[in-house]
Amino acid sequence: MTPIQEQLIALGGVFQAAVLVDRIAKTGQVSEAALSCMLGSLLVVDPKDTLDVYGGDDLNLHEGYRAMASALERDPATLQREPLRYALSMLGLERQLAKRDDLLEIIGKRIPVIQSQVEHFGIAHENVIAATGALYEDTLSTLRQRIQVQGDMRNLQQPNNASKIRAILLAGIRSARLWRQVGGHRWQLVFSRRKLLKELYPLLHG
């Protein structure tokens, strides 16, 4: 796997999270498989490669790849505006989080607690979702930059949906951190679009 492929997979995780947040906000729905993949990505501590974080299958990130491709292509007809906004916000929040050792310590201590809940209840259980959402609220929500989620207020006001959105945002920011760790930089999204798209299309259509 090339460095660019590793970066695209991690960035695909960011965009996958963004797409799912947008879907919950607008429809109140998300598949258990998609939710489980995102929550599971928070708990993988020793992956053999970047794809292993997302269950080892590109299909798990297909919607994220598609949203990323539309952003890189800059085609107004296919651009998914809200997911793009959420993805860029997550990249920005990750930069703020990286400077806060106190928040990273809280996350580091509470992820194993969530892992033990997963072993007891299963990964998509409402207790796990609530605990993961609360972790986002206690850490990322305290930063100056906030992600404003747009959608149907009836969906956004349901506590379970709000917890799912926060939990998925936490997973997306974990993906943003992974993207940085494998060499990703925001300037690539501006200056290396064609190169990224060339490597992304095989992942998208594979």
Curated annotation (Swiss-Prot):
Disulfide bonds: none annotated. SUPFAM superfamilies: YcfC-like. It is a peripheral membrane protein. Keywords: Cell inner membrane, Cell membrane, Cytoplasm, Membrane. GO terms for cellular component: cytoplasm; plasma membrane. InterPro entries: HflD (IPR007451), HflD-like_sf (IPR035932). The keyword Lipid metabolism does not apply. It is found in: Cytoplasm; Cell inner membrane. Its main location: cytoplasm. The keyword Membrane applies. It comes from the Bacteria. PANTHER family: HIGH FREQUENCY LYSOGENIZATION PROTEIN HFLD. Belongs to the HflD family. This is High frequency lysogenization protein HflD homolog. The lineage of its organism: Bacteria, Pseudomonadati, Pseudomonadota, Gammaproteobacteria, Pseudomonadales.
